[in-house]
Amino acid sequence: MNKELLQERKKMIYDFICDELYVPMKAKEMAIVLNVPKSQRGELLEVLDALTADGKVEISGRGKYVKSEGKYLTGVFTAHPRGFGFVTVEGEEEDIFIPAAQTNGALHKDTVQITLSKNSSGKRKEGTVTKILSRGTEQLVCTYEKSKNFGFAVPDNPRFAQDIFTPLERSKGGVSGHKVVVEITDYGKNGKKPEGKVVEIIGHINDPGTDIMSIVKGYDLPVEFSQKIMKQVENVSNEVSAADMAGRMDLRDWQTVTIDGEDAKDLDDAITLTKEGDLYELGVHIADVSNYVQESSALDVEALKRGTSVYLVDRVIPMLPHKLSNGICSLNAGENRLALSCIMKIDEKGNVIDHTIAETVIKVDRRMSYTSVKKILEEHDVAEIEEYKELVPMFERMKELAAILRKKRMKRGSIDFDFPETKIILDEQGKPVDIKPYDRNVATKIIEDFMLIANETVAQDYFWQELPFVYRTHDNPDTEKIKKLGTFINNFGYTIHIGQDEIHPKELQKLLMKIDGTPEEALISRLTLRSMKQAKYTTVSTGHFGLATNYYCHFTSPIRRYPDLQIHRIIKDNLRGRMNQKRIEHYDSILPEVAKHSSEMERRADEAERETDKLKKVEYMEERIGQVFEGVISGVQEWGFYVELPNTVEGLVHVTSLTDDFYHYEESSYEMIGERTNKHYKLGQKVKVIVADTDKIMRTIDFRVVRDDVEPDEAVKDEASVLSKMTD
């Protein structure tokens, strides 16, 4: 039984059991009452088992099915390295805390049944795991350690706190220091450790590339494409055929450019821009990937499974094979390419007066880089201007229109968090040689503004057509978090207006503008960001809080994001007159799962990208132990405070390293205060730190504060002395 059918039948049977005329009955009795054929009674049992597992239905002492009285809840367990955990229950506003003594063998990501504790106090609900319904993890990436008679594997993920016992005959010949994939064969109970077997040796911890591959395996990121998919891709032509171009709007004589990073290979968006009188005509042309990825094909199934391309520090794990993403789907200069275009007429106030969405064929004139466009528009580089002289007027118009669009967006309340992204430079061996903030300049902003307006325009168009669609939504912040933020910023003389338990994004935008350039900017910006919710994919257009718009979608990157590819299919069905009732019902049935899965895969990719960045930052700072840097306090907790350096590297100053006083954490003001000296360490404060230690396994960096009255050279000597005592 497929997932959709199971959900449908679960609802039907649950409604039947909840009916006031229902009397408790056994499965066989229920089958007779509901006229379920004998051949389908196994499916009825499957549905009843699922309802029981969900905690919605219970079996009485007489074996009869009754509605659960709420004694049990079902959810997913999230473990903490210190032993306790939380269970996320659908429909519950907050996660339920599970003390370490009440986890009863549950491991990270397990689906569990819990009961609420009677002694739950305050706002936090507590519970006890009563049953493990299903295991969430079958394999783990570990560091293998071999002893004389057995081996054990230490999970990379600190949320799996127990080592896994691994008999030598199941170790695949692993030696100490090998990164391995371990399959759990016995999850252990009553204090017994889990047992497992090595199913893959990734490489030795000291081998180049092993560190990144360990993260890839740890997040279960699919690297290779199957032979079936590669054979399917081999049949795709390297050139656009006349048949493919037939019936499309021909824009090949329009002056067209792509603007991307120098190392980008999958070019999925191109731009055209003209101006007649008071109206700009902006064309955003997106690679027509759906022409080459047929719905429900092996390639499409794999693309949906992946959900997104993953951009790790040293490699890209693509959603589509490179032959497509870098070849026929990439809008390479001088080549005929199929596109889906959103052509907008925009007035001088940034209003979209009219628009056309069409299947097109384009030919890019020049492949531009952000650096080149920046040199032309900001640095007025003579050589670059001469090289691209026929395009310079269009670039000037782009700068002009982007500024208009940005001004309009900001006027309505769009929030722009200008936190620096990281660019990590690696050598040929994969070692980090430089770390710096990513350059956000006039060229990157032009593309950002043009993609945003295209995404908004497409979303609004399909919202009013009332067709099935996938939107990109961002819910309003949690009221309690916003109120807490409002209380905190009062300490600095700032206020935000919260009306009827809701806040308008313009209030947060005005706050960010007020704090721009102030000492408390980093502090308040981070707290504002933390008060907001995550954006996600949905089938209902509930608006995008951060962009202050009622309509938004992801239309512009079908090479690397599945939701974009999905809505391209919907748009083309509509343009071709195929959106009949059958297709509408089809999309209504599949889109909720597409949206949910795509959101999950996006979060997985983001986490993997963050972990590889953290790993390389640790590796970079490992070579700089003993060096002094100036940074800004970026986070304060009871165990210490975090310091971010100008190159975006972040490390912890542990409270135990602050030896000049006894410091306590003041949660209301996010600062550490010395009891004797009254010395303060607070968010946004500049401090000098020395690199004390690094840990590649935990991906952490330890800093120590350098006193203002100590010269850097002396600080290095003092630190070297401390380190030698620690390691002696």
Regions found by a protein language model. Give the residues of each.
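Charge-lined substrate channels and their catalytic hotspots, especially those that engage the 3′ end
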Residues: 1-283, 290-336, 374-375, 671-672, ...
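Intrinsically disordered, low-complexity mixed-charge segments
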Residues: 1-7, 11-14, 23-24, 707-728
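Electropositive polyanion-binding surfaces
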Residues: 32, 171, 181, 186-188, ...
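A short macromolecule-binding patch
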Residues: 94-99, 160-166, 649-665, 713-718
